[in-house]
Amino acid sequence: MTMQKASKVNMEVRTTLVTMQATTMSIILALPLVVLIASTLVLSVKGRRIHLATSPIILLLLILFKKGQQARSINFTLSKNKSLFCLTFLNYPFHFITAWCHNDILNKYEFCLFLIFLIRIVITINKVTL
């Protein structure tokens, strides 16, 4: 009876650690997005265009996700959803990087696509944490 309780506690600890790891990755992924959105809003209120120097934020996001997917739970989830991974993390970021370089990110069409990209990131992170 004691071994079963110890095994159950051990399993709960492992589940908690995986959840904490996924939550930490979610926070790390969210920080560049918060900075990106805040800088976009501040610059659009001031009537200025976003400079090319701020585009590495998107590249940083992609690098962080690529590093983060090496975790077992995240890699397992993404390997089951290859099409979602390709749609979310391959098509949209390069489209935005191109738009960002041409200073078109404040265009309404580009901003709507950016919001769709954010929603897809949140959906993918939620699937990973569940």
Swiss-Prot record:
Q: Where in the cell is it found?
A: Membrane
Listed under GO biological process in this entry are:
mitotic recombination; replication-born double-strand break repair via sister chromatid exchange
Q: Where are the transmembrane segments?
A: 25-45, 50-70, 105-125
Q: Which UniProt keywords apply?
A: Membrane, Transmembrane, Transmembrane helix
Membrane topology recorded in Swiss-Prot or TrEMBL: Multi-pass membrane protein
Query: Where is it found, in Gene Ontology cellular component terms?
Result: membrane
Its chief place of residence is membrane
Q: How is loss of this gene reflected in the phenotype of the organism? A: Displays increased levels of spontaneous RAD52 foci in proliferating diploid cells.
Q: Which residues form the signal peptide?
A: none
Other comment? Partially overlaps YAK1.
Q: Which protein is depicted?
A: Uncharacterized protein IRC9
**Which species is the source of this protein?**
Saccharomyces cerevisiae (strain ATCC 204508 / S288c)
